[in-house]
Amino acid sequence: MAELNKSWILRQRPVGDLKEGDLELVEGPLEPLKDGEVRTRLIYLSLDPTNRIWMSDVDGYLPPVGIGDAMRGGGLAEVVESKFDGLKPGDIVNTGLATWSLYSNLPGEALNALPRLPGVPLTAYMGPLGATGMTAYFGLMDIAKPKAGETVVVSAAAGAVGSMVGQIAKIQGCRVVGIAGSDEKCKWLTETAGFDAAINYKSENVGAALDEHCPDGIDINFENVGGKIMDQVIARLNDFSRMPLCGLISTYNATEPVPGPYSFSNLLMRRTLLKGFIVIDYFPRFPEGIQQMAQWLMAGKIKFETDIVHGLENAPGSLSRLFEGKNLGKLMVQVSEPPEA
């Protein structure tokens, strides 16, 4: 019997939180492989806040996923068949913008076989050596340009991006304060990731805690969340501060217009540099970022956690973990067994 593909199809635009019926898991035959293509088997599927944006009919940095189309997403996959000279079966690739599918036919020229570094697990290519690591690296180093002695605040600090941002800032000699949603996460940030302080926004007064941990004000705010927490940080920014705007996860499931930051005028008074960015803007520079992150990772200067859910069928139900703050580190779905190193 011929092997079947499995794909999550977008059936309707979600309103608010993702619910049953918005996506449907379907089976179907494998598409014929064309010259120049490779067939990949998905190993790890990345779950990211941007997945929710792509489901909505909004004017984003990419067109929304069409109704009836396979859900867009990326991950790590193994080449199982190749009609492209540069890749062979057994190679591991980062799929880029593929789909939530067990098998995909992808253009070989857009892919590169990942090097296997000694002592580095494959999951590192979903974290510090993947898109989340590149988001942290370029957002901080290229936009914020941290200097030793500066104070850096990171929201969603125990997430895949935030945890990398804080550790890179520490390597640069900064004081780093993270904001997260549980005592467990705050403990990990200070005891494992090396943050100077961590604030549990669910149990602490964020403004008072920022005053305590940032007595000299805030030089860099790496923003992942938005909303009321962002307001508290903006109100404490220093002159000529920098604010890479990476995400606004608190707003992605909103069903009504979201009010703007009440402390917005402080960006003017403090002459803050505020810049939104998308990691794909930096794609041509990924080799530079991966090389540096790999050096830090292999030197033990970067720690990372993975939150792994098993089974492609569990992908939609697991996406909510991001918006509920339940994940520690990089959230992903293991779709199939990874090959032995």
Give each language-model segment a name:
Residues P29-L47, M55-T99:
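Glycine-rich beta-strand-centered segment in the early N-terminal region that forms part
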Residues S101-L102, G181-W188, V206, V258-F264:
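Short, glycine/polar-rich helix-capping loops at beta-to-alpha or helix-loop-helix junctions
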Residues M71-E78, P89-A156:
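NAD(P)H dinucleotide-binding glycine-rich loop of Rossmann-like/cofactor-binding domains
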Residues M126-E204:
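Mid-domain Rossmann-like dinucleotide-binding core that forms the NAD(H)/NADP(H) cofactor-binding site
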